[in-house]
Amino acid sequence: MTHLLITGARGQLGSDLVARATSAGLPVTGFGSRELDVTDADAVDRALAGFAHDAKGDDVSGTAVVINASAYTAVDAAETDVDAAYAVNESGPAHLARSAARYGIGFIHVSTDYVFPGEGTRPYEIDDPTGPKSVYGASKLAGERAVLATYPEAHVVRTTWVWGATGGNFVKTMAILEASKPTITVVDDQRGTPTYAADLAAGLLELATHPAPGPGGVLHLTNSGETTWFGFARAIFTELGADPERVQPTTTDKFPRPAPRPAYSVMSPAAWVAAGLTPLRSWQDALSAAFAAAPEVFRPAPAGV
């Protein structure tokens, strides 16, 4: 049996990883930032030593895997909070990878489309040149490199446009705006793939429990298909039972931000599929399924509640 340790367990992806692992009957330990500061090398080493000991003591034939879902994700704030971004996104993964290698634990590190320049016209493959345009992207790329330099058998899994039931995200923001504004404008010149955190968690657990053959390295995992933020917003309005025409297109230059956003973030699943792993369903099917299963999660609470 696979024993799991999830870092960033209180976040959008981490909470779904813990929930999915629990429902699958897998032994799982979840650490949020309060329980484990990934930037503290000694704390990380103690945590992973204890995890390895407990996992091997419980099941001598089992395996132990750490999935790192912790990250500094404040893209704009990272432009000025550089040291903090690198501490969490580079040093943290390096500490985890080093201790995982030391104790014979599998390691999966979650990364991002922001490592690419965002100027492509076809889905990015795992070996396409990187070239981040923001501090956030550069810190995540530094983390990828630190992980694989320290622990070549580890897996780095890049994803994009993640949304889910936990915390704030684009879907919940659109629901709030739908309830409060007659019309909204959303950029139509940034293209990517909305990825449902629950689906992403399922894919990562498949990788953890049925490792890809061969050495470690980079993989891409997103829902399938592509759209723009404008197209995604209109699909959300449709799921809310609202008129999608209330969403109007605009361009990125109308919304200047401290950190540049990639114009193109679509990533190819070819390496994931070639490894014998299951591709994720379309982003449209994931959105519809999420609303059908728990519509109240993605709708703003009535005033006064």
Protein language model features and the residues they cover:
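SDR active-site strand-loop-helix element
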Residues: 7, 31, 69-70, 107-113, ...
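Mid/C-terminal beta-alpha module of Rossmann-like enzyme folds, strongest
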Residues: 203, 210-259, 294, 298-305
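NAD(P)H-binding glycine-rich loop region in Rossmannoid oxidoreductase-like domains
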Residues: 41-90, 99
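Rossmann-fold cofactor-recognition segment
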Residues: 29-42
